[in-house]
Amino acid sequence: MTDALRYLTERDVVSVLDIPKAIEALHAMLVAQGREQARNLPKALATWGDGSSMHALGSVQTGAGGYAGFKTWVHTKSGGGSLFSLFDAESGFLRAVIEARALGMLRTAAISGVA
């Protein structure tokens, strides 16, 4: 893998990820978590003003080829946005920044398929 940082837009995400792939990925990570090869970071939340909020959560897959990632997002009355930062879990190198709205929707939909 090269050391180039990738930026993926919402369009990029939906062009390469679909529900079957998301189900497969979630299943694999739940198995890894059961084997103590993956961990989740509890969600953090802060609020301000009249209903604005910021959120963060993350997970890591340990071992060779593992990744650590954080989804962060903000909601305000004027709008919001979300990003996923993906790191190499061994080197700590930032591999990608991914626009995360579609990614989150696919994950939420796919978890039902895992069940």
Language-model segment annotations:
Residues 1-105, 111-113:
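N-terminal ligand-binding/catalytic initiation module
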